[in-house]
UniProtKB/Swiss-Prot annotation:
It catalyses: [GlcNAc-(1->4)-Mur2Ac(oyl-L-Ala-gamma-D-Glu-L-Lys-D-Ala-D-Ala)](n)-di-trans,octa-cis-undecaprenyl diphosphate + beta-D-GlcNAc-(1->4)-Mur2Ac(oyl-L-Ala-gamma-D-Glu-L-Lys-D-Ala-D-Ala)-di-trans,octa-cis-undecaprenyl diphosphate = [GlcNAc-(1->4)-Mur2Ac(oyl-L-Ala-gamma-D-Glu-L-Lys-D-Ala-D-Ala)](n+1)-di-trans,octa-cis-undecaprenyl diphosphate + di-trans,octa-cis-undecaprenyl diphosphate + H(+). One of its GO terms (molecular function) is pentosyltransferase activity. It is found in: Cell inner membrane. Peptidoglycan polymerase that catalyzes glycan chain elongation from lipid-linked precursors. The keyword Lipid metabolism does not apply. InterPro entries: Glyco_trans_51, Lysozyme-like_dom_sf, PBP_transglycosylase, Pep_trsgly. Pathway: Cell wall biogenesis; peptidoglycan biosynthesis. Signal peptide: none annotated. The gene is mtgA. It comes from Pseudomonas putida (strain W619). This is Biosynthetic peptidoglycan transglycosylase. Belongs to the glycosyltransferase 51 family. The keyword Disulfide bond does not apply.
């Protein structure tokens, strides 16, 4: 009986691995029609009885402001061009900080955030973290850095029911994502850690301060020219 259970488990793991690989490969070229986070928000609205209108309009790489691309990297993952999905020093620093009793501090890279938002549910269980690591590795293996950032920018949450750069630009500033200024891009990047609580168009003192820090980091990275580095390390 035990051997039968083990065989069934092995088959289940095989088909899960095969299915997830196929899914990641498909999304290498095909825009994801939605995300797990969007489904989660919709379910939460049904449970609470508060209707939510999900806004999302996929935009290709060239239709998104370069300033927003750099601002997101500056604010969320400055080692994005160099790592393979995991920022080990940042993870170690976050673990040490949390062990000292501070507020829970994360160290997720942009790739990890894409894996979580696209495929998984919210939470901090070891199962979810393990699946996040699996999908992160697959994404880094099969996608370019440009594709990872493109999917992130089209999937990130920027307000209640607001997903992706185009919906965010229209919701907060009434313009297309391609026309975002450096300041507007920094404000959008500044609210990513808490997009429901914070507003990019009506920034609190903290958000304004964080946006200023992000602008300085954008300059240190080299501005839009930094984007040329994204896949340089992967070229033969």
């Amino acid at each position: 009986m035990l051997s039968s259970l083990l065989r069934r488990l092995a088959r289940a793991l095989f088909w899960f691995a095969a299915g997830s690989i196929v899914l990641v490969l498909v999304f290498r070229w095909v825009p994801p029609p939605g995300t797990a986070l969007m489904v989660e928000r919709k379910v939460q609205s049904w449970v609470s009885g508060e209707p939510i209108d999900l806004q999302r309009d996929w935009q290709p790489w060239e239709s998104i402001s370069d300033d927003l691309k750099v601002a997101v990297i500056a604010g969320e993952d400055q080692k994005f061009a160099n790592h393979w999905g995991f920022d080990i020093p940042a993870i170690q620093a976050a673990l040490a900080y949390n062990e000292r009793g501070g507020n829970i501090r994360g160290a997720s890279t942009l790739t990890q955030q894409v894996a979580k938002n696209l495929f998984l549910w919210s939470g901090r269980s070891w199962l979810r973290k393990g699946l996040e690591a699996w999908f992160t590795a697959l994404i880094e293996l099969f996608w370019s850095k440009e594709r990872i950032l493109e999917v992130y920018l089209n999937s990130a949450e920027w307000g209640k029911g607001v997903f992706g750069a185009q919906a965010a630009a229209r919701y907060h500033f009434g313009i297309d994502a391609s026309r975002l200024s450096r300041q507007q891009a920094a404000q959008l990047a500044a609210v990513l850690p808490s997009p429901i609580k914070w507003s990019a168009s009506r920034p609190s003192a903290y958000v304004a301060s964080r946006a200023g820090w992000i602008r300085r980091q954008m300059s240190q990275l080299g501005g839009p020219s930094y984007l040329m580095q994204l896949d340089a390390s992967r070229r033969p």
